[in-house]
Curated annotation (Swiss-Prot):
Location(s), subcellular: Virion
Protein name from the UniProt record: Capsid protein
Lineage of producing organism: Viruses, Viruses incertae sedis, Anelloviridae, Torque teno virus
Region: Disordered, residue numbers: 23-44, 598-619, 660-700
Keywords, comma-separated and alphabetical: Capsid protein, T=1 icosahedral capsid protein, Virion
């Protein structure tokens, strides 16, 4: 061959060096297992190219040679040692819980806040939204109710370690669900939390889980599994159960939704909603603190406008009204039919009633109604012929039921002649047109005279702005109830005001942009109670005025107009969840042996069946190192004197079984109510209790009582200093917990 000499003597160009591939050492096999025998690699038939393998012949390529690489000096391994208790036991807390229970007409309520309510049978229960927060204290409370089981007792090991949890949601037949979990602080509800949990906003969230119904997705898995790691700020180390008890482990927000009909129910032909709003002349005298001049102005408008009396109920409340104590006598003054009613035809735009000329008689008749309900009633006269219920008599008759400012004569929505002017206006809301910008929603007490929005000062509570109404009203009434606390009846102490320029007509006044509008439901306008019954108690007949109690239905209907909202067409919808929380108990266990006489029994008949092992679960708050026996407490077969003295100081917890919490434990705290209504620490005390008595009190108080008071203050101060010292020692030892995780404490 002509080029043979070149191939014999010419060396090929040197290959480009590359690092030699390091061989992994063979994994050490488990002892006792035979080595896996070699199997010939299975051949795979491949399609060959028609013209053979493509080769790059243009130019020449260097041939690569393998050169032994130079390895960097390996750094020394750092061995991190963590202290472990002598005894460690894994514990799985498994339980079932109705995360959401929504009765009919409760579509805008929060079930977590009402989960412990005693609702009478026949009335709806719960809500479509549930915001729950889980901690070791909540799990123990669920165990006391028989809703979970613990795989290993916690009464012998005082240390704990949290390793995460898992929730299993079971799909329902007709209702869809959407949820979101949170493991970041703060675990609190603010005024914008519930609007963000509306299905229309939650469907757009990045981190969420969907639970479709069988009607939406007939196929698929029967359950949705959600695995949740420990909190972000939680340091994985050993804590005492006493410290870990109040740590928030996870917060869940689950809401009922509708994936099949996101923008309207098939039972309706219109996505809009119409409700009634008071006219603007009411808003200067809406509260108790309004002046007599402003109230008289409202009565002058109502009693001088004949069109406002065009109602079917007018003759029953005005003409020839008889007394309640004696139906044979007429109230004074007696207004006859011939004087008050005109003989005209309303088809020709004539007013039926002549109220303007009987203005003074109407005022006197309203006062007569008020006397029949208060001073002349059985509750004041203590008559044996009637039921004497005791309640405080109002100071004004402006809110009388029959002829007061908010009588059904003026506010009934179904008018016999709709074209006549009335004391309210019909407002229509289209959720698709609500941009949110310029909307204002707030709650104010009945003591506020007008409906002017005051951002600073605290007179307007839970002020929400720039949010669509279908999201702002979601869980809003329950948030107000949690803000005001468990000792305030939020439904009867105030009302909700709204500013919304996206309704028709707009609930917005250009000349007075900060004036709020008050809406009410149909039952209040018809003079009925919230459940539709027409019998009104005398207590409410002298207090007939707009309250948040009479605004719940309107808020629920507006919430249903939002996208993906729950349509509330079923008797109830329930979402059941199974949870598993993984803990590890640790400590220095003292093994106790219970030895019985094998030759004698306790008198009960023997049973060949195997009984389940009883798990003793103790309150985690009572499982600190101070209240548990350890192996080092034994000295020569006996407990040491210090251990016995330490256990004698343990408080008894029998009373905690009968006392109910002020709010459900699974309900997370709110920002305003956290410091005011949370459960007090043991040994904590308020500023009023620590304050010293004034000089006048010391002069009148006896010396013995004063010394006892000083001694009580000193003991409380001692407990507080002991708590502060104990927390300081925990911080120095690295056993403290991030305070941001203790919002429920």
């Amino acid at each position: 061959m002509a080029w043979g000499w070149w191939r014999r003597w010419r060396r090929w160009p040197a290959r480009r060096w590359r690092r030699r591939r390091r061989r992994r050492p063979l994994r050490r096999r488990r002892a006792g297992r035979p080595a896996r025998r070699y199997r010939r690699r299975r051949t795979v038939r491949t399609r060959r190219r028609r013209w053979g393998r493509r080769r790059y012949r243009r130019g020449w390529r260097r041939r690569t040679y393998v050169r032994k690489g130079r390895h960097r000096k390996k750094k020394k391994r750092l061995i991190l040692r963590q202290w472990q208790p002598a005894t460690r036991r894994r514990c799985t807390i498994t339980g079932y819980l109705p995360i959401v229970f929504c009765g009919h007409t409760k579509g805008n309520k929060n079930y977590a806040l009402h989960s412990d309510d005693y609702t009478p049978q026949g009335q709806p229960f719960g809500g479509a939204l549930s915001t729950t927060s889980f901690s070791l204290k909540v799990l123990f409370d669920q165990h006391q109710r028989g809703l979970n089981k613990w795989s290993f007792p916690n009464d012998q090991l005082d240390l704990a370690r949290y390793r995460g949890c898992k929730f299993i949601f079971y799909r329902t037949k007709q209702t869809d669900w959407i949820g979101q979990y949170d493991i970041s602080e703060p675990y609190k509800l603010d005024k914008y939390s519930c609007p963000n949990y509306h299905p229309g906003n939650l469907i757009k969230a990045k981190h969420k889980f969907l639970i479709p119904s069988y009607d939406t997705n007939p196929r698929g898995r029967q359950k949705i599994i959600v695995k949740i790691p420990p909190p972000d700020l939680f340091v994985d180390k050993w804590y005492t159960q006493e410290d870990l008890c109040s740590v928030n482990l996870v917060s869940l927000a689950v809401s009922a939704a509708s994936f099949l009909h996101p923008f309207g129910s098939p039972q309706t032909d219109n996505p809009c909603y119409t409700f009634q709003v008071l006219k603007e002349f009411y808003y200067q005298a809406i509260g108790f603190s309004a002046t007599d001049e402003s109230r008289n102005y409202v009565f002058n408008v109502l009693y001088e406008e004949n069109s406002y009396w065009e109602s079917n109920i007018t003759p029953f409340y005005v003409i020839n009204v008889k007394k309640g104590s004696n139906t044979x006598d007429y109230m004074s003054p007696x207004i006859s039919d011939s004087h008050f009613r005109n003989k005209v035809n309303t088809n020709y735009n004539w007013y039926t009633y002549n109220a303007k000329s009987h203005k003074n008689d109407l005022h006197x008749l309203r006062r007569a109604y008020f006397k029949q309900l208060t001073t002349e009633g059985p509750q004041q006269t203590s008559s044996e012929k009637g039921y004497a219920s005791q309640w405080t008599t109002p100071t004004t008759d402006a809110y009388e039921y029959h002829l007061g400012m908010f009588s059904t004569i003026f506010l009934a929505p179904d008018r016999p002649v709709p074209r006549f002017p009335c004391a309210y206006q019909d407002v229509t809301y289209n959720p698709l047109m609500d941009k949110g910008v310029g909307n204002h929603v707030w709650f104010q007490y009945n003591t506020k005279a007008d409906t002017q929005l005051i951002v600073t000062g605290g007179s307007c509570k839970a002020h929400i702005e720039d949010i669509p109404l279908w999201a702002a009203f979601y869980g809003y009434s329950d948030f107000i109830e949690s803000e005001l606390g468990p000792f305030v009846d939020a439904e009867t102490v105030g009302l909700i005001c709204v500013i919304c320029p996206y309704t028709k007509p707009p609930m917005y006044n250009k000349t007075n942009p900060m004036m709020g509008y008050v809406f009410y439901d149909r039952n209040f306008g018809d003079g009925k109670w919230i459940d539709g019954r027409g019998k009104i108690e005398p207590y409410w007949q002298v207090r007939w005025r707009p309250e948040m109690l009479f605004q719940e239905t309107v808020m629920a209907d507006i919430v249903q107009t939002g996208p993906f909202s729950y349509k509330d067409e079923l008797k109830n919808s329930t979402l059941v969840a199974k949870y598993k929380f993984y803990f590890t108990w640790g400590g220095n266990m003292m093994f106790q042996q219970t030895i019985k006489n094998p030759c004698k029994t306790d008198g009960r008949p023997t049973d060949s069946d195997r009984h389940p092992r009883g798990i003793q679960v103790a309150d985690p708050e009572q499982m600190g190192p101070r209240w548990v026996f350890h192996s080092f407490d034994w000295r020569r077969g006996y407990l040491s004197e210090g251990a016995i003295k330490r256990l004698h100081e343990k408080p008894l917890d029998y009373e905690s079984y009968f006392t109910q919490p002020k709010r459900p434990r699974i309900f997370p705290p709110t920002e305003a109510a956290e410091g005011e209504f949370r459960e007090p620490e043991k040994g904590s005390y308020s500023e009023e209790e620590r304050s010293q008595a004034s000089a006048e009190e010391q002069a009148t108080e006896e010396t013995v009582l004063l010394l006892k008071r000083r001694l009580r203050e000193q003991r409380k101060l001692e407990q507080q200093l002991q708590f502060l010292t104990r927390e300081m020692f925990k911080t120095q030892a690295g056993l403290h917990i991030n305070p941001m995780l203790l919002s429920q404490r």
